[in-house]
Curated annotation (Swiss-Prot):
InterPro entries assigned to the protein according to its UniProt record, in alphabetical order: Glyco_trans_19
Any one GO molecular-function label of the UniProt entry: phospholipid binding
GO biological process: lipid A biosynthetic process
UniProt entry keywords in alphabetical sequence: Glycosyltransferase, Lipid A biosynthesis, Lipid biosynthesis, Lipid metabolism, Transferase
Top-rank taxon: Bacteria
One protein family per Pfam: LpxB
Gene name linked to the record: lpxB
GO cellular component: membrane
Catalytic activity: a lipid X + a UDP-2-N,3-O-bis[(3R)-3-hydroxyacyl]-alpha-D-glucosamine = a lipid A disaccharide + UDP + H(+)
PANTHER family documented for this protein: LIPID-A-DISACCHARIDE SYNTHASE (PTHR30372), LIPID-A-DISACCHARIDE SYNTHASE, MITOCHONDRIAL-RELATED (PTHR30372:SF4)
Name used for this protein in its record: Lipid-A-disaccharide synthase
NCBIfam families listed in its UniProt record: lpxB (TIGR00215)
Amino acid sequence: MTKVYFIAGETSGDFIGGRIIQNLKSNKGVEFTGIGGKCMEEAGNFKSLFPITCINLMGFVEILPHIFNLKKLIDKTVQDIINSQADLLITIDSPGFTYRVAKQLRKLLPKLKMIHIVAPSVWAYKDGRAVKYAKIYDCLFALLPFEPPYFTKVGLDCRYIGHPIMEQEFYSDKIALREEFKIDKNERVLCVTLGSRQGEIRKHLPVFISSIEEIFKSCNNLKVIFTLANPAHEAIIKPFLEDVQFHYLFSSARLKAYAVADAALAKSGTNTLEIVASGTPMVVAYQVNLISFFIIRLLIKIKYVTLINIIAGSEIIPEFIQFNCRASLISNTLQELLFNSKKAYKQVIESQKILQTLGLKSNRSPSYIAAEIIKQEFLESKIKLLKENST
């Protein structure tokens, strides 16, 4: 039996892992194990070592209360990989956790083949992660077409596979969606997306809700859809909404929510690309602990946080980061998008032009490309040997 050990630490990584498992599971004699979420568990006979929420953390100061528990989980994961006698380790994003696991294993199991999916954003930071990854991993799968040269020049085999949003089903029939969400003709719809990390949800809710309340003062026909990366997040959000006047609902069908909305208020992340692909204008807002912010400012070498803006070199999508993450600023810009169709249309068109330049259209899905590389270059010889021994 060929054993593949996956580690995914957040919702986006779980989606990627799940699709790769779906593409690999037709190969008899391959067993999947590791750490993942719902998508990976539903894709095959996969049971996670522990819930991914345990390692779904971000920031510098923010992770300090969890540092000892994270160390225990890293050690537990390393030992589980050793005990499983895995033939291949595939880590997906979550570099704060996955890199530390891989680094330990490179010393303990020098012959273990290791692949990392989602290249670290070395083009955005003043750091030496390309060299660090080259010392640990055998291969790196990049989601963006311009990323491989940053790694190949330091000796790491890096392949462009495409972005997972290529595998999403996007919706365009707003009339049908409005009926599905029971939205009246005269209602304006704002979609709010807070991400998958509980700490970030709690951090952003007060300013997001204040922004919505400002809009509601002049737009009492506003309906708000809070998207849920995890159904359990509804219990986190609800207490913040006890005294609000605006109408709201929750939805786990985030792509439908993005498509039905007239505008979106989004935390920075992969969700912004999905909102662009859904044809909805948005405002991006984000804040972290003050110490974390100043550390990031020392490391970062880019002006924007949203990928569309980074590629464009200009602020196509309005960003309100840290000290500018204020209800007065956010609400004014959102109202312009909700009620100024020219501004909204301009943002959507310009954003989608940038999206197309990322090479996000292909006849083959990223998970299929990734699975073929894994199968042909990392698993085929072992599978063939097992077949020969069984005959």
